[in-house]
Regions:
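Alpha/beta catalytic barrel-like cores
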Residues: 1-176, 189, 193-213
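Carbohydrate-associated surface elements
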Residues: 180
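Short acidic, Gly/Ser-rich segments with clustered Asp/Glu that frequently serve as metal-coordination loops
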Residues: 183-188
Length: 217
């Protein structure tokens, strides 16, 4: 089915105008130039760190081709346009690998907001988050290996569990499917065990309301 769709460019690119397709082709030709990409990345990172006014330039060039927006409301025009062709969207707040408790709490709050938003929008069939958006990778690894935790680590893991509980509970109450994205294999055992407990708790009344994504080799 998918092969037939993409063999028919009139269907595959029906949401794009000729000028948008020309722009996309030009952009991918630039990206294919490795030295240019290295230089562009370095210049962009410097400009952002120096707080230079480059956001408008980024939005006008590469941003719109790869991103739907910078917020839920900002993504709405793109999501609504795609939904007219039967294409759904997922707002993936793909923060991962952080080390700070404030960042973990911020990721949880953003996920809660996305669940609330998904409840209202037919074009968003589910919400998703990454395990290391809610806790340290090293902590997941230690828990998965059944290594002993000190007092502070026990408290830290309790906070991770509480974040999972908060988003799973809201997803259940709002009847929004929730996916937990798989990450590195060496931390996945702890995430799998925690998600399984959440599935056992919240998937009793409705099948597949909470879904774990597994790592495959």
């Amino acid at each position: 089915m998918m092969e037939k769709i993409f063999n028919n460019t009139q269907v595959a690119f029906s949401l794009k105008s000729d000028s948008e397709l020309d722009r996309a082709y030009f952009l991918f030709k630039l990206i294919d130039n490795e030295p240019l990409v290295r230089i562009g990345t370095a210049v962009t990172n410097f400009a952002l760190k120096a707080h230079l006014p480059v956001e408008g330039l980024i939005r006008a060039s590469v941003f719109d081709h790869f991103c739907g927006g910078v917020s839920e409301d900002d993504c709405m025009p793109v999501m609504e346009k795609m939904f007219t062709k039967g294409v759904c969207s997922v707002l993936d707040y793909s923060v991962e690998g952080k080390e700070d408790e404030h960042q973990f709490d911020a990721a949880m709050k953003k996920t809660l907001k996305i669940i609330e938003f998904a409840k209202l929008i037919d074009a968003i069939p589910f919400a998703v988050f990454k395990p290391t958006g809610f806790g340290r990778l090293d902590l997941y690894t230690k828990v998965g290996n059944k290594d002993p935790l000190n007092f502070e680590e026990h408290q830290e893991w309790d906070r991770v569990v509480a974040r999972y509980e908060a988003v799973c509970k809201l997803a259940f109450e709002k009847e929004v499917a929730l996916l937990i994205d798989a990450e590195e294999s060496w931390m996945q055992d702890a995430a799998d065990e925690l998600v399984t407990k959440m599935m056992q708790k919240y998937n009793k009344e409705k099948a597949q309301e909470l879904v774990n994504v597994f790592v495959t080799n």
